[in-house]
Amino acid sequence: MLDIKFLRTNPEIVKTNIKNKFQDEKLPLVDEVIELDKEFRESKTRAEYLRSQRNSISKKIGFYMAQGQKDEAEKAKAEVASMASELEELSAKETELEEKIRKIMLVIPNIIDPSVPIGKDDSENVEIEKFGDPFVPSFEIPYHVDIMEKLDGIDLDAARKTSGNGFYYLKGDIARLHSAILSYARDFMIDRGFTYYIPPFMIRSAVVNGVMSFSEMENMMYKIEGEDLYLIGTSEHSMIGKFIDTIIDEADLPQTLTSYSPCFRKEVGAHGIEERGVYRIHQFEKQEMIVVCKPEDSMDWYNKLWQNSVDFFRSLDIPVRTLECCSGDLADLKVKSCDVEAWSPRQKKYFEVGSCSTLGDAQARRLGIRIKSKEKGNYFAHTLNNTVVAPPRMLIAFLENNLNEDGSIRIPEALRMYMGGKSVIEVK
């Protein structure tokens, strides 16, 4: 959410930003919110004047009574009563205007970083860099579900019976591999100085509205019927929510956190063959990294976060690349974002396995996350997030890049201690 003062003084910058995000339908909202803000400030000015006048007249009532000037006293009382009535009306009006302004401000997108390429959707994202050499083996690589079934590691039919489409049973060595990857991700981030958390898996609507746009919420989140609770789509939501209405001393920054959680998403719509199996599902587990920092440090942390993802995947012998997300592909709260994509030797292309974002002070402004400074007073923090790893999708990249011709799976050195010392998962 933008600062209303910034919008008031820079309406053309805000409008240009909206155009760059290809959201022209929101352009009228800028002028509308400016008019509402003007009306709100005029009402506040009138209310301040009335309070000053009321206080001045109220002081005279006692004087009039002491002087026996009852008529003057009654006249003053009537003026005070009239002012009180108008003040009550103004207060109600201000509350209504504040709500209208907030609703509009919540849908006006954040100002993107100047380095973000202008583009309409993800097809116009720009490759930044490749890490590791993508390879295609001499043998044919099966679909990831077929690989898992050959290892007796997945049961989709049973999951459809118990839960419907978009769910899975992992078992045996594949289930163990799934857990091993998450355990390794946890320790990988702890070794880089991040504090490990297991957060609540449900959050209230106040937090939901603070961390994401309404449209994102509608498309992603499951609501608990009869409760003011939503199942989280990522632990970023509950971890950023942890700081709601908090003032953090500058000396305690940055806050660098890594969190594990199951995640739940609607994933509405039909999907092609490449998004079936365990690629696009309603329930999965994820290790996340979150940073709360001073504004001047946020871009440095942004670069550190995506580099963490690259280093993690390369430690597991998976080639990756980074993509700069274009303006039209950025969610409304994001200032800048890059996707981390893993190489698929079966498809001979990269696919998304994580996303790193800086949101400026958008989430902090919505949730009241401020920094305490002796020199600057209290000011809003910056927040960032990035995926460490999200199996089972990451399993697709892992299995394809570590598949042997006989169907067995190589276990990289980094994971073996989490797999009981195994170096290979054998075909059953």
Where are the regions a protein language model picked out?
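N-terminal alpha-helical targeting/anchoring segments
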Residues: 1-134, 149, 153
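TRNA-recognition modules of translation machinery and tRNA-sensing kinases, especially anticodon-binding
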Residues: 27, 130-428
